[in-house]
């Protein structure tokens, strides 16, 4: 789970 997941959410 990368930081990108935060943006996706």
UniProtKB/Swiss-Prot annotation:
Q: Might you name a Gene Ontology BP term for this protein?
A: defense response
Protein name listed in UniProt: Pathogenesis-related protein
Choose one Gene Ontology CC annotation of this protein and give it: extracellular region
Which spans are transmembrane here? Answer: none
Q: Where in the cell is it found?
A: Secreted, Cell wall
Q: Where is the Barwin domain?
A: 1-9
Instruction: Could you list this entry's UniProt keywords, alphabetically sorted.
Output: Cell wall, Pathogenesis-related protein, Plant defense, Secreted
